[in-house]
Amino acid sequence: MKLPIYLDYAATTPMDERVVQKMMQYMTKDGIFGNPASRSHKFGWEAEEAVDIARNHIADLIGADSREIVFTSGATESDNLAIKGAAHFYQTKGKHIITLKTEHKAVLDTCRQLEREGFEVTYLEPESDGLLDLTKLVEAIRPDTILISIMHVNNEIGVVQDIKAIGEICRARKIIFHVDATQSVGKLAVNVQELKVDLMSFSSHKLYGPKGIGGLYVCRKPRIRIEAIIHGGGHERGMRSGTLPVHQIVGMGEAYRIAKEEMATEMPRLKALRDRLYHGFQAIEEVYVNGSMEEGKRVDTNLNMSFNFVEGESLMMALRDIAVSSGSACTSASLEPSYVLRAIGRNDELAHSSIRFSLGRWATEEEIDYTIELVKKSILKLRELSPLWEMFKEGIDLSKIEWNHH
């Protein structure tokens, strides 16, 4: 077993060797390097064909028509394009948007920007298990609601929202429904027809493909219109201008093809490893799982635990042989407690002591067992240094202690 161990697959994944091999054929003068928009010669035609094949692989994985796939630079851009694009196009119908407090920052910050432009946004509270209560969603809908944006799988706590039911609610009321599916594509069966989704964002680097490329599904029936946010050349049916990066698109297509083929065998293996990790941690006192652990309500690759009476940052230092994260990679640089955990009602102490373990293609049983032992050992050591742990063990109710500020 090689150290350090990588258990941060929800932040990014290494590229699959098969993806790299495929991409190498689309870069040099001996390969297919043409611009797919060059319609007058073979170099362009070959590049365009490669893009079409990749587009088909991506559409196949999510049950879409290949004409409904728009390439972007990644899921953050896809979220921006979907939310701003739909809000701007349909603003004459209304200016009210509904989302969830635990969404990715790419959704929340985009909504904040729209608020500055005069849109109104309702940020719904999730339940304590991280899931959205659909009656609260229905109650929040107004006559001027034009867009609802709810993620499929949460990037921090891995809970799976009932996208199908939300899709039905939106269709019945003719409200546009956007889903950030960055953490679910390739891990859960996703079919945009069944889920009644209008716009869906997804990424490549969370699925063993290259960074810097992603996609947005834009429904054709019923036809959804969005206003472009990048102009110049009218690529991607006018929705996203810019020369298509063929090698990245081919890499993403190959990654999605592999995912479709191997998902059925890969996910049960990863679920078994995740459950092994979870049961290994059960032996530790005062540990709490964040988000629902109910069957079907959590993605099989995610485990987010809070270890009470231990500071998350010091635990991360003790676990430097294991790549894990506190919060999401996009926000873990700030020492603020995770806004996702605060939204599900965790106090500051538990939010600060949370660690996200996310598993993927190359995680092994040996690595999981090593992780369990190292976490146990580190927690015992850190708690020995904690006066709060000592007081807790003596039966003192810490919530009743009055602290003096110097």
Curated annotation (Swiss-Prot):
Gene3D superfamilies: Aspartate Aminotransferase, domain 1, Type I PLP-dependent aspartate aminotransferase-like (Major domain). Keywords: 2Fe-2S, Cytoplasm, Iron, Iron-sulfur, Metal-binding, Pyridoxal phosphate, Transferase. InterPro entries: Aminotrans_V_dom (IPR000192), Aminotrans_V_PyrdxlP_BS (IPR020578), Cys_deSase_IscS (IPR010240), Cysteine_dSase (IPR016454), PyrdxlP-dep_Trfase (IPR015424), PyrdxlP-dep_Trfase_major (IPR015421), PyrdxlP-dep_Trfase_small (IPR015422). PROSITE patterns: AA_TRANSFER_CLASS_5. Its main location: cytoplasm. The active site is at 330 (cysteine persulfide intermediate). One of its GO terms (biological process) is [2Fe-2S] cluster assembly. Pfam families: Aminotran_5 (PF00266). GO terms for molecular function: 2 iron, 2 sulfur cluster binding; cysteine desulfurase activity; metal ion binding; pyridoxal phosphate binding. Pathway: Cofactor biosynthesis; iron-sulfur cluster biosynthesis. It is found in: Cytoplasm. [2Fe-2S] cluster binds at residue 330. Pyridoxal 5'-phosphate binds at residues 75-76, 155, 183, 203-205, 243. One of its GO terms (cellular component) is L-cysteine desulfurase complex. Its cofactor is pyridoxal 5'-phosphate. The modification N6-(pyridoxal phosphate)lysine is found at residue 206. Homodimer. Forms a heterotetramer with IscU, interacts with other sulfur acceptors. Belongs to the class-V pyridoxal-phosphate-dependent aminotransferase family. NifS/IscS subfamily. Master enzyme that delivers sulfur to a number of partners involved in Fe-S cluster assembly, tRNA modification or cofactor biosynthesis. Catalyzes the removal of elemental sulfur atoms from cysteine to produce alanine. Functions as a sulfur delivery protein for Fe-S cluster synthesis onto IscU, an Fe-S scaffold assembly protein, as well as other S acceptor proteins. HAMAP family: Cys_desulf_IscS. This is Cysteine desulfurase IscS. It comes from Haemophilus ducreyi (strain 35000HP / ATCC 700724). The lineage of its organism: Bacteria, Pseudomonadati, Pseudomonadota, Gammaproteobacteria, Pasteurellales.
